[in-house]
């Protein structure tokens, strides 16, 4: 096989240490030379690792994406001008029965040396930092949804079926009623009806029927209040994250506005997309490769004339849900009915 990188390095990364193997292939021989060294993952030792690589004129490094342990190594080497390829572990998996830390780094380096390692997409630093915020926002929104469900279930077990009447348990009328039910006041039907607003006043009888016979212990009231406070706190944190994100994406406003011209994409979706794939689409080569990277394309798995599972992959953990949400919104878009007419 052709040697793509005459001088390169394979790195096996762990939580507390890494093993690096520099591979040098002489011009007059296909037999490579190996130099191995072990470093800790403290910044001082990572800089020594970078010094060692530069001393041997090794500017191409490959390591597998082991958890988050590769990130500090990548940060240091990137700052020192060393090109780092991050590989999916499934592409550099060592042969069973012949595996240890030293052999792993050598194996990774050997595969990389002859160009058999596919590089994972690593955006620039600004996009990576933005990605940390958007992914954290995704987690906060998930937590908020969990608290909403927990709040609703807390009333269900207390024989309150208000969620069967109102569309949103956190709407103005529903909030007023739930606050009243968890207060120390004795229940008064007339006062409860007076808390209803707008269209919900027409459902006053249904609201009372959904509440009639409820029983909430003091301990349950305390738990419900804690859940609400946590929900409100999460909402505040989401607003704080949004403020910070809007400051960070100021330089990408043109890209965001362009994305928002696509049916189904709003500002939040556009920011999520940019945070996941950046703004330079040359990284993917084609739209098909991008869809595959996002985990939206079916697999191709056939052996001996039998087709096996072709389900979509687990890739695109954060991008895929955003694009699926965009697709649902596009189908319901009345202003741009192309997808609505095509798929509904």
Predicted regions, residues:
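A detector of single, family-specific signature residues
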Residues: 1-344
